């Protein structure tokens, strides 16, 4: 019903196609993350006519979709191979493919059979084949939609390595970022700053009288006393450093010196204030063609702030470990396909 899922009235859509064997999966993802704004939402059901392989082949040369996201429960006979081949062709054509495969457990396989009459097959075989074809593999539903948002935002950005820059005014968040750079699925590193970067960071810290509280490091804990200018300038310096390939910045929404609220009469907290973090970080994002991800770890009162960042092409996560994990999976997949010819 329109009352439960209102159609967005937009004049333009993102260059994304989401293909799913479940119509409800499509509706729920779009309801949770309307900012995805896909050009196509396609429900395949039990593939009685067109198959997942057919749909992937259609988008290989499409000039309307650069990101293709697929939720699959199973393939028709021999269609899994066609699908993997189409993924490889799509990636070679500059597309980004995001893939979630259902039926990972014996119970899950039985459930897919009852849902779309799909034979789920061996999950690990399927995952390895599609990954090697060049798709970005989502491990859960939340990650699926977050990877779509990263792919949309960073479609034209350079991914040249695995060296992250991390900055936050919350000590636990800086530690959490460092703790999240490696897992069984990915392995990133924290980049080393150039001497000119370290010098510029120290000058900023000295100017703001934070020098007795802040030590230049990666991750960079800039203390809760760091204002919007410090946050944005540190992100700018990191992105400008050739030794850093992407930046994750914690925006400390509860800090008394950051502008992160929409509904407030206190000018010092208003997110639309001139010179606030929204204005400053947007300018930084526009200047550099490297991935920049924000973390806004706070309650519902900060949702307008998160939405405003997303509108400015800055992906936002509610917790730092999810930000690092999703960005890492995305970057490693982008690096892998660089070798495809």
Per-segment meaning from a language model:
Residues 1-341:
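Catalytic-core regions of core metabolic enzymes
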